[in-house]
């Protein structure tokens, strides 16, 4: 289905066709493919906001509600960006699951919340991944005094890098520069776009 969707989205000629495909994928609970299709459509100047940010199926949404340590909209936004709601996603760097946790980070976080670390559960059990990922983001938010921009950058690139960037470029929380300028100075394009 993934290959078929990729071929189909690249061959779409009208906005109407694109909307039909994305709606169909959402109805089939193929959220990650719907997000992929909507991202590809943007490259062709087809932007449909209400389709670009789908809410996952009810069962998964309930899992977020029951397991998140952070506001659900934040956990959903992180998961959409990190994995497009693909619970089995594994990045080239080795990050795993819905919230794309690196195994080492997951192990440390599991210990902090008195959970047994089980690597395979990062991709097999959404509740496990959401619990660990949301707790880790909560820690980043606390570490950077409630700054979502800094916490998101730390979640994606690591807190040590963010601390280095604060020393190098200045701290938007202190008024050294505005937040948008700080974000634009992030040297890793993936993290800059992520934030």
PLM region spans:
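Catalytic glycan-binding domains that act on GlcNAc-containing polysaccharides
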Residues: 2-195
């Amino acid at each position: 289905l993934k290959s078929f969707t990729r071929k189909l989205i690249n061959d779409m000629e009208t906005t109407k066709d694109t909307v039909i495909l994305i709606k169909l994928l959402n109805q089939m609970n193929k959220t990650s493919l719907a997000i992929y299709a909507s991202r590809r459509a943007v490259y062709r100047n087809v932007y449909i906001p209400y389709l670009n940010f789908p809410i996952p199926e009810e069962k998964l949404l309930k899992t977020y509600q029951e397991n998140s340590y952070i506001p659900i909209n934040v956990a959903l936004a992180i998961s959409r960006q990190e994995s497009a709601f693909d619970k089995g996603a594994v990045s080239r760097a080795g990050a795993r699951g819905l919230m794309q946790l690196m195994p080492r980070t997951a192990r440390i976080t599991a210990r902090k919340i008195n959970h047994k670390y089980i690597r395979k559960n990062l991709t097999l059990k959404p509740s496990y991944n959401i619990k660990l990922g949301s707790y880790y983001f909560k820690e980043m938010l606390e570490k950077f005094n409630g700054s979502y921009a800094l916490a998101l950058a730390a979640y994606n690139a690591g807190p040590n890098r963010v601390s280095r960037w604060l020393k190098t470029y200045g701290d938007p929380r202190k008024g050294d520069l505005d937040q948008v300028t700080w974000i634009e100075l992030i040297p890793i394009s993936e993290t800059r776009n992520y934030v």
